[in-house]
Regions:
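Signal-transducing coiled-coil linker helices
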Residues: 1-50, 57-67, 118
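Conserved long alpha-helical elements within nucleotide-processing catalytic cores of c-di-GMP signaling
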Residues: 55-77, 87-114, 120-124, 128-129, ...
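A structural signal for short, well-ordered beta-strand segments
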Residues: 78, 127, 165-169
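Short beta-strand-to-loop capping motifs
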Residues: 129-134, 171-173
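Catalytic-core segments of nucleotide cyclases and related cyclic-nucleotide turnover enzymes
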Residues: 140-147, 151-158, 164, 171-203, ...
Length: 210
């Protein structure tokens, strides 16, 4: 964004030098500010306000571009996450605190993922991470980092509740299926993890889980 702001000013300054007497610098400033405003507005359209992460529209655009480009040399992996206890938080502490839990989940994931991938909130209590990988080992390593960040937050005791995620993943390569298949595989993998955690007594068995 800063580059978009500076380019018209630099051009205006150069033109001012050649066309003395014309107020071209301020014209450049005006154009720069308009360009910056338009760019900020475009970026805002792809950001989920509650979590501060990218939204579903941005996620769809990334997958579409990846598909059109024929895929990258390295595979595209997706890790889907679901906040296990959001319904309980809403029921016990109110929806305002439920919104805060979504915001906290976004911060936990941002701290874990860093620049390794793109973070999006799909809606409700579901998030997804997209990342280019060279081996499946990288997925496991990132999952471990996420778990460590979750533990760190929960042990801080900052809230009267804990944040926990069910997670699932899949790897997308163009020749192996469609985008829809990719998303369905991740979703199925995540709910298998949730089912396993319910079976192990880690999660309560809720028929309608949020």
């Amino acid at each position: 964004p800063a580059v978009l702001f500076m380019i018209p000013i630099i051009i205006g300054s150069l033109l001012q030098f050649f066309f003395y007497g014309y107020s071209l610098i301020w014209l450049g400033v005006s154009i720069g500010m308009i360009s910056l405003f338009i760019n900020v507005q475009k970026e805002a359209a792809y950001v989920d306000i509650l979590s501060g992460l990218y939204n579903r529209q941005y996620f769809n655009n990334i997958l579409l571009m990846h598909s059109k480009n024929g895929g990258a040399a390295d595979a595209l992996a997706g890790i889907m996450l679901d906040i296990d206890n959001l319904k309980s938080i809403n029921d016990r502490f109110g929806h305002a605190e439920g919104d805060e839990a979504i915001s906290i989940a976004g911060r936990i994931l941002r701290a874990a993922v860093g620049h390794q991938g793109v973070l999006c909130r799909l809606g409700g209590d579901e998030f997804i991470i997209l990342m280019h990988i060279n081996s499946q080992k990288e997925i496991g390593e990132l999952v471990d980092i996420i778990k460590a960040q979750v533990t760190q937050f929960n042990e801080s005791g900052k809230k009267p509740y804990e944040i926990h995620f069910s997670m699932g993943y899949s790897i997308y390569q163009n020749e192996h299926g469609s985008i829809d298949d990719f998303i369905k595989k991740i979703d199925a993998s995540m709910y298998e993890d949730k089912k396993r955690r319910i079976g192990a007594g880690i999660l309560p068995d809720r028929r309608h889980h949020c």
